[in-house]
Amino acid sequence: MSAFNLERFRFDKGKKIDTEFGEKGASSRPSTPNSQLEDHVTSIPETPEAKRVNNPSLFKKDKGVSFLDSDSENEDHQSKSKFSSTHQQSHPREENGTSDSVTDDSEDDYLAVKRPSASTAQVKDGSKYKNLQRLKEIFPKQNNDELLKLIESTSTLDGAVAAGVVLFNKEGSSRKRKLDEVPKDSSPVHEGINGQTKKKKKIDRVSSDNDSSLSEDDWEKQEASVKKLQRHFPDLDKEELREVLQEHDWSFHEALEALKLFAEDETDALQNAAKKEVSNGKEFSRSNKNDNKSSAKAKANQNSNKAMAQNGVKKKGKGKKYSENAKRDTRDLESEESASDAGSCLDEDYSSGDEKLEEEYKTKILSFLQDASLDELYLIPHCSHKKAQKITELRPFSSWESLFEKMTKSNGLSEDLIWDCQTLIKEREVVMKLMNKCEEISRTLTKQVTQLTEDGECGWNIEQPSIMSENLVLKPYQKIGLNWLALLHKHKVNMILADEMGLGKTVQAIAFLAHLYVTGDSGPHLVVVPASTMDNWIREFNQWCPSMNILLYYGSQEERKHLRYDILNKVVEFNVIVTTYNCAISSAEDRSLFRRLKLNFAVFDEGHMLKNMSAIRYQHLMTLNARSRLLLTGTPVQNNLLELMSLLNFVMPHMFSSSTSEIKRLFSSKAKSTDEQTIFEKERIAHAKQIMKPFILRRVKSEVLKQLPPKQDKIKFCQMSKKQEQLYSDLLNKLKKSIDATEKNSELCNVMMHLRKMANHPLLHRQYYTADRLRTMSKLMLKEPTHCDANPDLIFEDMEVMTDFELHRLCNEFTTLSQYKLEKELILDSGKFNILEKLLSDIKKKGDRVVLFSQFTMMLDIIEVFLRHHQHRYVRLDGKTQISERIHLIDEFNTDMDIFIFLLSTKAGGLGINLTSANIVILHDIDCNPYNDKQAEDRCHRVGQTKEVKVIKLIGKGTIEESMLKISQQKLRLEQDMTTNDTGDEGTIPLDMATLLKTSLGL
């Protein structure tokens, strides 16, 4: 089918006219200057005969060889890219405008049409006239001039017919419009310039026509038809296929029919042309027999289209829906055409395959629509919940005909949904193939571990690398992790170490880099970490592996510039580069460094930061030039399965990248969440577990750390104070009215945030500082030396957007406003503070210490006032704390037992820090993502903890926080499903691999 390439009928955009002449005519006659050539080709039909320029021919008339002027010649240039110049057919220019071979009156009429045009070659024999008449029968609406151009631009009648199908549509020839736009006086030099813009003009014209008359949905459907057609004819240009579809009123099957009807004959013609060797100026031609055959074929095409229209091909809507009879007729014709093409594959349209495959997929579609759940039906492209519900109401579908009839006759449904099922089925097949690949990898790894265990090879047991500190020893489960990493690396498989937080993933990664070092791979390696854990990584490297050279890539832009120079010019020696996510991708120079630097191994700490494959961070880090990758994350499954698939795609892009779109659709959380887990959801979880099995190792603390103290979770529902409850109710009613007016998702997010703030503390809104009070305060601010020249109206505008607590701090800062400070009772007026006061008092009596988290830094500001009021000693760390100061604050809290409370913001203090000196975790306000809270609470519940850990969550009773808690529990259930083995006990992933490794190591 690739030989059927209509590109050769288009204008040549690249070649120069004088190059053509130089190759063919230089030896016969000197070439004419450009000025003369320009005069020759710019004679227009309206020029009188007496004044017409009549230059001599540029070349000698070699036998059987002729040359056309600029218009015709451009048609031939494209063809020359496909065939030898000796295989092309043109006709010699007759200077007097007549041909000796023409004798009858009808031929004279034909010449009368062509004689005025300087761009038309003359008729040499009667065969051209016969071809013209045949084309006239096939394209009765086109004039002789257009049809003759087709004959001259192709070597066969079949080619002319095929070109005509593409170029002529029912509303007029777009090709003719295109030619009319070219100035008549364009010279060969100008022609080359104009030719470069012709395709763009054509695209713009088609786009503008469609945009003005079609809706966005119709345009998308038309684009889908073009793509489907291009899969059958990959060598054809999209715009040419679009014209074929326009010719057939955007009927995909009719357009496919028309193109396939001529493809076979055109292929034969091209093959025959390639076999014939034309030399010494002998003219290549087709026999009349073949011409008759192709003409009959073209007529058959017209007749078949008419017959289809008469036999029940009904166009519905905008020409995209057909009756079942039409589908059957179309498939019969396609089956005849594809009988000779045994290698044709099933593509977007199942009816284009052979009969067995077609019936097989019909059966799959019928079975799917009959048995699929609502969630599965909802995954069909363009299928809404309402349509899915209608499909279930139409069941049962006893046969294909019954399905087709019910779908086409039901309001709101169409046959498009039937054929869109193929997309979903195809995506499922892609995921199944991916699962089979993963299963094969898993079997290979399991087989090797089993074999090594049975053989008892001592060399398999990878001990703690010799360059690691002798004073520190890996724990047994950490040694298993090291061996697992080494095994997968040996098989060139990247991995995700997903041990539960607190099991020492950092140490296992350092041990693996040390193992690479002692086995001959000294780097360079890269470790990318969050800013909050960078100091901890440097400390762990120095403690566990002091002999490795660690380079910290961090600092200002100027400092990183010098570091880049040293790295690229090998001024500094290093084995491992440690940097942050921000420094690795913040500028083009940073990204360029890690693309140019050939890294042997890259480690990404807190890998769940790469859970969104559409994020800029994800896409930039994918370009790192690393041979192997390792992700460390304590929460591989957070909101949905798609995030897990994103992690797998990041570590194994060569395996997953080709299936990204299928993975996105099948594992996206399009279906609505329900309390009961559907069969479909269970199947998706099973599929995800099978895919992730070879690449992820996860152990939980309850299994591997028998000596680790238990952790208790407790939820405290806090009744709001009376004033707070009234304010919350007023805010809720106000927001309900605004939601009814807008109903936008962005507004809903704002509503949720406003309610969360009010549930935590009333001072996070502006309630007490009225507009009148702010007017007075803005004028008083003019008495301050820093604001004496300020505009009070601008000060008022700034104050309007501030919260009550911010305005209270402003009053503390400026003495002129001190009279407007809030009373301490208002600051302490919070339902959660009432619970917290008693809670902290009891904890302090027992001698325990507290780590308190909040989502809002302003809430931490208010909590500081509360702690000072009750004389509790504390330290604080949030996103504004300098990176260099964070490690000192952590050390201070862990060593000074008089510090009772460590205040942290959940995002800044919830990652990668060790606070085992405390055993009580209080979450003042929960996160929408429960895994952020889990990360936070595991700052205490980790290796090194000796006391029982209690996690207390404060939930505002009767507030939006209760709904957030319910959603969080559903998300946590997904993780439990993913980390549960086949027997139902929570365990490792994959269980069998870790068990085998444990056995092989004798642990």
Curated annotation (Swiss-Prot):
Keywords: ATP-binding, Chromatin regulator, Chromosome, DNA damage, DNA repair, DNA-binding, Helicase, Hydrolase, Nucleotide-binding, Nucleus. It catalyses: ATP + H2O = ADP + phosphate + H(+). Residues 15-130, 172-235, 274-351 are annotated as: Disordered. SUPFAM superfamilies: P-loop containing nucleoside triphosphate hydrolases (SSF52540), UBA-like (SSF46934). Residues 486-654 form the Helicase ATP-binding domain. A motif (DEGH box) lies at residues 605-608. Residues 295-311 have a biased composition (Low complexity). Residues 172-188, 221-235, 274-294, 321-333 have a biased composition (Basic and acidic residues). One of its GO terms (biological process) is DNA double-strand break processing. Its EC number is 3.6.4.12. Pfam families: Helicase_C, SNF2-rel_dom. One of its GO terms (cellular component) is nucleus. ATP binds at D499, E500, M501, G502, L503, G504, K505, T506. Residues 221-264 form the CUE domain. GO terms for molecular function: ATP binding; ATP hydrolysis activity; ATP-dependent chromatin remodeler activity; DNA binding; helicase activity; ubiquitin binding. It is found in: Nucleus; Chromosome. InterPro entries: CUE (IPR003892), Helicase_ATP-bd (IPR014001), Helicase_C-like (IPR001650), P-loop_NTPase (IPR027417), SNF2-like_sf (IPR038718), SNF2/RAD54-like_C (IPR049730), SNF2_N (IPR000330), UBA-like_sf (IPR009060). Residues 835-997 form the Helicase C-terminal domain. PANTHER family: SNF2/RAD54 HELICASE FAMILY. Belongs to the SNF2/RAD54 helicase family. This is SWI/SNF-related matrix-associated actin-dependent regulator of chromatin subfamily A containing DEAD/H box 1. It comes from Xenopus tropicalis (Western clawed frog). The gene is smarcad1.
